[in-house]
Amino acid sequence: MARRPGSSSRGPARSDRLPTEAVTSARKPHAAAPTPPASPDPGLVLLGEFGRPHGLHGEVRLKSHTSEPLAIAGYGPLHASDGRTLELANVRPAAGSSPDLLIVRVKGVDDRTGAEALNRVTLAIARERLGEVEDEDEFFLTDLIGLTVEDGAGTVIGTIVAVPNFGGGDLLEIRPAAGGPTALLPFTKAFVPSLDIAGGKVVADPPDDLFAPPGPKPADDPG
């Protein structure tokens, strides 16, 4: 779960439903460990991504995107990006300093070959299973996809099509209203001073050259 840029955190949610406060795509990632974008399907919320196999008996590394990494095991069957429905078992922290890196076993996967097939597969949960957020400052990053982007004068400048994170913080990928290539805008209070998910829009203060085409390469640039 994400929060509006510049807002403060709150206490845990009620325990009589799925713990929505555990789901996040907006945590500050560890250096050199970029997180994947919010699910391109607005009906799904990303929970994690598998990595390399661990050992010979079906265990596999999993990067959890929940605020409590081990909580990912409590969501039951999950949507996998390869089209399968998968359920986790025997979840434990991996050795090392990254608390969001786990060693897990997937039900029905009992050997290294099966674990290798999971590498780079992502896990997601249906948005409706998470219920509604209880704090107006909280939302899921997937809720941003499809929102209209306006400037301070109320002029529509584009639409959010994705929320990637390459290690330096969440970004809004915006398709310009006038057409052309998308552009990336940092999802910070400075660039996105106002957010109205219920109203279907965000107000942005982008740089003037946000949608400007890249300039010519220097003559000595080997690329």
UniProtKB/Swiss-Prot annotation:
Keywords, in A-Z order: Chaperone, Cytoplasm, Ribosome biogenesis, rRNA processing
Positions of the PRC barrel domain: 135-210
One Gene Ontology cellular component: cytoplasm
Region annotation Disordered: where it falls in the sequence: 1-44, 203-223
Compositionally biased tracts (Low complexity): 1-12
MF annotations from Gene Ontology: ribosome binding
Sequence similarity: Belongs to the RimM family.
HAMAP family in alphabetical order: Ribosome_mat_RimM
Quaternary structure and partners: Binds ribosomal protein uS19.
Free-text note on domains in this protein's UniProt record: The PRC barrel domain binds ribosomal protein uS19.
PANTHER family the UniProt entry points to: RIBOSOME MATURATION FACTOR RIMM (PTHR33692:SF1)
Name of the protein described by the UniProt record: Ribosome maturation factor RimM
Source species of the chain: Methylorubrum extorquens (strain CM4 / NCIMB 13688)
Lineage summary: Bacteria, Pseudomonadati, Pseudomonadota, Alphaproteobacteria, Hyphomicrobiales
Gene that encodes it: rimM
